[in-house]
Amino acid sequence: REKIGVMFGCFNYSTRVQLADRTTEKIGKIVTQKMDVEVLSYDPDTDRVVPRKVVNWFNNGPAEQFLQFTVEKSGGNGKSQFAATPNHLIRTPGGWTEAGDLIAGDRVMATEPHRLSDQQFQVVLGSLMGDGNLSPNRRDRNGVRFRMGHGAKQVDYLRWKTELLGNIKHSTRVNDKGATFVDFTPLPELAELQRAVYLGDGKKFLSEEYLKALTPLALAIWYMDDGAFTVRSKGLQERTAGGSGRIEICVEAMSEGTRVRLRDYLHDTHGLEVRLRQSGKAGKAVLVFSTASSAKFQELVAPYMAPSMEYKLLPRFRGQSTVSPQFVESTQRLVPARILDVHVKPHTRSMNRFDIEVEGNHNYFVDGVMVHNSPETTTGGKALKFYASVRMDVRRIETLKDGXDAVGNRTRVKVVKNKVSPP
């Protein structure tokens, strides 16, 4: 099979390619002028978005039609837009997919800024276990908003947490009761976390993977947010030297299954004796630590406590805090982004189709969305004889529960399109 032509998709002249210097340029101009530029490209070996040279330019003549895509993004006007031929390959969370097989509501892979350091991500994890929350961006933008709020007596603690996230743009407001709330700019890197924690039943769901990711800093923030410490002895007797007490942490906001998983995690990972019980007239769920485990837990989290919250520690554990803000430079990383609209683009004066070839990775980004760089026609004896395109309809038929806790879905999959065609 020599000199076999393999067909791939292309883009409309005006589709904007992201260059390595973070600017954009129309793909038609890059091709017609054979611009010697570097573009952003995804390197799967390092899981990074990196600069790569354009090594070939293709003007493949008129197209019958282009599909106009609008995809959510966090910056600018909140929308990525590009026009591709129906057979161009677009990257999705499940792999490469032809543009013509995508519909509104599907998700594609897009590059978005990641701003959080490992320390800051732990602040988010710990806060979500306590008083923090993540809410979707309601303006069809990619990313979710992280919010923290505390009463007037804990404003110093809130200020301490906010300083740990000090490089993230945020706004602060105080309500009529003196409670202070801090809202951070939408962060695309937290979108998947939001979807995993909030399953729609009003309670927070923390998976085994979530719990395994926790560090002592996250546990400290959880304790400072929702924990209470009752002193049982001031340590005046030899057998209680250093004092003793018992920790209770409210877990009412968590699902029933999550409460059990958290109790087991504390026992299995940290060797803590913890039990679940109902507290007060309202019967709120709390985790109660034994006296010995209370001291052991405080020893674990003491280096990560805010100075204003050290009253929740035994005297011998106070003054150990070593926490200081750790910021990192923003980097571009891949995240899923929802398609807002797909329609056939009206004919324009120029219907020519353009593509580029990128060195090494064979992909690039059009207005932030990851696309394949294959040219419209290539030749070579290793060309595939057929291409397969399968579309499956996935429907939820049953919710799987752990007690009263929804932990998954049973689904039915039906093949609704199965196309095999020569190139």
UniProtKB/Swiss-Prot annotation:
GO biological process, one term: DNA recombination
Keyword Zinc-finger: no
Pfam family, one: LAGLIDADG_2
Keyword annotations from UniProtKB, A to Z: ATP-binding, Autocatalytic cleavage, Cytoplasm, DNA damage, DNA recombination, DNA repair, DNA-binding, Nucleotide-binding, Protein splicing, SOS response
First-listed, main subcellular location of the protein, grouped into a coarse class: cytoplasm
One GO CC annotation: cytosol
Subcellular location: Cytoplasm
InterPro entries referenced in this protein's UniProt entry, alphabetically: DNA_recomb/repair_RecA (IPR013765), DNA_recomb/repair_RecA_CS (IPR020584), Hint_dom_C (IPR003586), Hint_dom_N (IPR003587), Hint_dom_sf (IPR036844), Homing_endonucl (IPR027434), INTEIN (IPR006142), Intein_C (IPR030934)
Annotated transmembrane regions: none
Modification note: This protein undergoes a protein self splicing that involves a post-translational excision of the intervening region (intein) followed by peptide ligation.
PROSITE patterns: INTEIN_C_TER, INTEIN_N_TER, RECA_1, RECA_3
One function term, GO molecular function aspect: ATP-dependent activity, acting on DNA
Family per similarity comment: Belongs to the RecA family.
NCBIfam families from the UniProt entry: intein_Cterm, intein_Nterm
Protein function: Can catalyze the hydrolysis of ATP in the presence of single-stranded DNA, the ATP-dependent uptake of single-stranded DNA by duplex DNA, and the ATP-dependent hybridization of homologous single-stranded DNAs. It interacts with LexA causing its activation and leading to its autocatalytic cleavage.
Designated name of the protein: Protein RecA
Organism in which the protein naturally occurs: Mycolicibacterium flavescens
